[in-house]
Amino acid sequence: AFLVRDTSNIQWLTAFDDVFDEEAAHALYVCPDHAWLHTDSRYVTACENAARLKPLEVSAERETHAQFAAKRWGGRPAGAADALLGIEDGVSLAEYRRLQKAFAEADAEEPFVETDGVVVGLRAVKDRYEIARMRGAQSITDAAFEHIVRYMRPGMMERQVQLELEEFMLRHGAQGLAFPS
């Protein structure tokens, strides 16, 4: 099994559009034949709608992501006693300790194995859909650059330019900014 906590990786693995923001309110628990997304009540409706045709179960159970993972681990199929649970290399020490505690409370041995860029490696290979989206994003960026060059005037505050640039990109279809402007 594999536990994913990075929101960008969860978004890529689930292929959910316009569901997640930057808050770390989600955990994805993936097994060979099933996956569960643990989220909080603010996101559950959007996640359930996005998951309708996917082999993914959405849960908003009131428990920590670590407790959720421990519960899923306890319910793994017979014969999986020697299995491991991969965790992302970006998991914080605090999150790791919560996992240890939740698994101890569930009387489960620690099955954790650190992974190194598993999802990042998968994300590096682009399909036609992703390439089309990248081209669309580049078109928005090009148009925004042309607009902002014409918009700027001597004496303007940087903040004015920043807000105009961001607003232009969002008005023209950007879902957000790739990095702060």
Regions found by a protein language model. Give the residues of each.
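Active-site cores enriched in adjacent His and Asp/Glu residues with nearby glycine-rich loops
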Residues: 1-10, 139-181
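A composition/biophysics-driven feature that prefers long, compositionally simple stretches
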Residues: 1-146
